[in-house]
């Protein structure tokens, strides 16, 4: 899948390029050129790591399925105490999605724990070897 800049729709890049670059040269965000259809009923049968891999693979088409499966398993496994994407029953058919089971007890863990793995793989996909410093 290609991603284009919000400031120049003619500027298209792969998912690896978008992740490695962050922002477009014009200062825009990279957005997917389309939004794939997914089988929601099939997704409901998966645990959170498998569901994440299934959705992400539709967008990050230059990443291998094996890498995405392993990355989501490692990311949403032990660090989330087995409760990644946990739906807590409230009452009857009402549930609350608990987003605080990550290592820092914040919703941001869902993205920020996976992103470094995606960045390292993006650099491999692009043949880039320079060091990257991530400030947290």
Residue ranges with predicted function:
Residues 1-136:
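PLP-dependent amino-acid enzyme catalytic core
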């Amino acid at each position: 899948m290609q991603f284009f800049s919000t400031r120049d729709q003619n500027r298209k890049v792969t998912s690896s390029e978008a992740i490695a670059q962050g922002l477009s040269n014009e200062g825009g965000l990279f957005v997917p050129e389309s939004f794939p259809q997914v089988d929601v009923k099939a997704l409901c049968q998966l645990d959170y790591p498998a569901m994440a891999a299934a959705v992400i693979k539709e967008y990050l088409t230059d990443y291998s399925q094996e890498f995405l499966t392993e990355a989501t398993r490692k990311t949403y496994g032990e660090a989330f105490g087995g409760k990644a994407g946990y739906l807590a029953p409230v009452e009857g058919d009402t549930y609350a999605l608990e987003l605080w089971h990550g290592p820092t007890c914040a919703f941001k863990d869902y993205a920020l724990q996976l992103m470094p793995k995606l960045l390292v793989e993006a650099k491999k996909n692009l043949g880039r070897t320079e060091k990257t410093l991530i400030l947290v």
